[in-house]
Amino acid sequence: MSAPPVTERALVLRIAASGESFHKIDILTAESGTFLCLKRLSKNRSQSTDPDLFDTADIQLDTSKQGTARFVKDYQLVHRHSAIGQSYRKLQHASDFCALIAQNGPHMADPAALYHITERTLDAFAERALPAIVFLKAIYILLKDEGYPVREAWWPELPATLRQSAKQLIYPPTPNSATPEQLEACAQISRNLCRWLRRETDLILPNSLA
C-alpha cells in the first residue's frame, strides 16, 4: 500500500523530459530537502498546472508502492519568477545555482535553511539587474551557511588585488548598476571561489561551472 499523499511548498530547480508522458522535476522543500519527482504531462495544460523553472508551488506528492519514486498528484502555482527567463544571463546564472543545489542538496544538513537561501536567491535573480553579482553572493552565503571556512581559508587565498572588490560585491545589497571593471572583477572572484569550492569541499559543481 502506498503512503498517503503529502503537500509541500516547493521550489522548482530543474525540469527534464522523461519519455513522452512525464517530466522529471528536481524540487526543494523546507521539510524534505531536494529530491526528484515525476509529473505526468497533462492533455489540458495550463499556465498554473504546468511547472516552470524557478516556480514556487504547493505540490501534492504520491509515493509509489515500492517507495522508490514520487509522483506529482497536484500542482498549485504560488509564484512564478518570470523575470528570470526574460534575460539570458539571469537564466544562465539562476540555472547554474539551482543545478548546484539539486546536485548537492541531498547531502546538506538543514533543508529549511537551504530553502530560505534558495528562495531569497531566486527573488534576487528576478528583481536585480546584475545576476553575476547575485550568483557570487549566493555561492559565498551558501558555503558559509554550510560551515565551510570561506572567510578563514578562501579569503586569504584570494589575490590581494581582488579583495577590495570582493568586499564591495559580497557584503552590501546587490546594486542595479556596475562598471565594466566591477563586472570583470566579479567574474574573476566567482571563478576563484568555484575553484576553491571544487578543491576544498565535498560539493559537486555542475558541468556548466566545472
Can you annotate each of these PLM segments?
Residues M1-H23, L28-A210:
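Non-catalytic alpha-helical scaffolds and adjoining flexible linkers that form interface surfaces
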